[in-house]
């Protein structure tokens, strides 16, 4: 089961709602996953379509409990192994579909004319409880969230730009920073930051999924920190090894060209130590001297040795 399905299954458990909350959730679901249709005799019907049976059952229950609409759930079998079955909740004309659609904000009536309403109805977001339930409904109807092990991405998909922009504004009232983009004929409201996705899951009441995502975030952060430390240590080790190889090459050149005994005593001591202990750090080399010399002092002497070797190379040319 995908992480997105887990989230939706979790939030479908909220079935004990007030009438206003039920209207807000149905509005969220129906405005993004519903289709308005007409029969041959021009009688209106409305279908909610979903691949998740839990969403179909929730829609069925909310319609029955709060509107006394006893509809049915139809299953459209998929012939493809890769595709899921489609679950349809169909509300016919004789079930009072027109009044229902006006109440949930799918339709609006102005000057005797009934038209589709592409806005976020004010009634659905007038208080915090309804606003949260409405966002939850939109997520159930047209939302998805990626596997947090791979990437952080949560989105809502709708076919109407005005609705997408208004929904983004509603989401952002919680201090989030959702953005809207067009994807072919759809408009997508999305969040890409892990912390903001956690906040959104909290808003819609997906607390178990929130904890799972937080655990993934913590583990990923720990892995990233370990990788950074390993990379840093590897880089430092590589620099140390390269420097030691370069220093030994310079010392051997001096030994061949003029002999180490020609070096000042303080440089000769360090040169011999470096030859005898090629894997030791500068700090460890310094501690072998009597009296001990600090890391910067050893580094300074080795630089002087390398400078002498460089001058010998130039003379050799």
UniProtKB/Swiss-Prot annotation:
DNA-binding region residue numbers: 281-314
Domain of life per record: Bacteria
Record keyword Manganese present: no
InterPro entries: Homing_endonucl, Intein_endonuc_central, Sporu_reg_WhiA_N_dom, Sporulation_regulator_WhiA, Sporulation_regulator_WhiA_C, WhiA_LAGLIDADG_dom
Protein's UniProt keywords contain Mitochondrion: no
Entry's family note: Belongs to the WhiA family.
Protein name per UniProt: Probable cell division protein WhiA
Species this protein is from: Clostridium novyi (strain NT)
């Amino acid at each position: 089961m995908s992480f997105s399905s887990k989230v939706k299954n979790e939030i479908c458990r909220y079935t004990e709602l007030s009438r206003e909350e039920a209207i807000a959730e149905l509005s969220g679901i129906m405005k993004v996953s519903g289709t308005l249709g007409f029969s041959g005799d021009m009688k209106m019907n409305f279908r909610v379509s979903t691949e998740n049976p839990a969403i179909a059952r929730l829609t069925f229950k909310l319609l029955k409990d709060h509107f006394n609409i006893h509809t049915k759930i139809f299953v459209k079998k998929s012939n493809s192994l890769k595709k899921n079955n489609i679950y349809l909740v169909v509300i016919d004309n004789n079930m009072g579909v027109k009044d229902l659609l006006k109440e949930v904000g799918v339709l609006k009536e102005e000057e005797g004319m009934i038209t589709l309403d592409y806005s976020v109805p004010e009634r659905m977001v007038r208080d915090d409880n309804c606003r949260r339930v409405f966002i939850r409904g939109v997520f159930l109807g047209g939302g998805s969230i990626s596997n947090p092990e791979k990437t952080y991405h949560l989105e809502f998909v709708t076919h109407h730009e005005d609705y997408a922009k208004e929904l983004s504004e509603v989401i952002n009232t919680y201090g989030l920073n959702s953005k809207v983009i067009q994807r072919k004929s759809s408009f997508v409201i999305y969040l890409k930051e892990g912390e903001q996705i956690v906040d959104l899951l909290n808003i819609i009441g997906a607390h178990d999924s929130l904890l799972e995502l937080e655990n993934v975030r913590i583990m990923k952060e720990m892995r990233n920190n370990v990788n950074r430390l390993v990379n840093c240590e590897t880089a430092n080790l590589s620099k140390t090894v390269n420097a030691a190889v370069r220093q030994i090459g310079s010392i051997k050149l001096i030994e061949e060209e003029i002999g180490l005994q020609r070096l000042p005593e303080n440089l000769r001591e360090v040169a011999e130590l470096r030859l005898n202990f090629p894997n030791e750090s500068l700090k460890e080399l310094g501690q072998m001297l009597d009296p001990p010399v600090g890391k910067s002092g050893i580094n300074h002497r080795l630089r002087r040795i390398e400078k002498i070797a460089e001058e010998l190379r130039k003379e050799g040319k």
